[in-house]
Amino acid sequence: MFVKPGSTISLTCSIRLFSSPPTSIQWFRDTRALNLDSARGGVSLENEKTPQGTRSTLIVTKATGDDTGNYTCSPSSGHAASVMVHVVDGKQYLVKLAFEIAR
């Protein structure tokens, strides 16, 4: 997933109810648990129980390059899911991509 600096990142993890619902859902960036109370601010989590299971949405506002990473949603019961997020200026990415293709 590619996003521009200053935009909002919204990642949703849906945990389907097969047996027991998860007692907790933890989010990670790379290998570190996300701290919703960090000095960076602008990071929030919304968890919602639905008839089908649980939905957890991670919201990161005013994205910067420091927010680039592999985001993982890890429920206490069930399998984790991950997505790679890149915060880049579109022009910089096109130049890098052109360089990689030229090699």
Question: Over which residues does each language-model region extend?
Answer:
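Extracellular beta-strand/loop-rich beta-sandwich domains predominantly from IgSF
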Residues: 1-2, 40-70, 76-77, 87
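A short local loop/turn or secondary-structure capping micro-motif enriched for an aromatic residue
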Residues: 43-45, 81, 103
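Short, charged helix-to-loop "capping" segments that act as catalytic/coupling loops
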Residues: 16-21, 49-53
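Eukaryotic short linear interaction motifs
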Residues: 2-3, 20-21, 34-35, 67, ...
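Extracytoplasmic/periplasmic beta-strand context in beta-sandwich domains
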Residues: 25, 56, 81-83
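Short, solvent-exposed loop/linker segments at the N-terminal edge
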Residues: 1-9
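Structural signature of extracellular immunoglobulin-like
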Residues: 10-17, 24-32, 67-77, 86-89
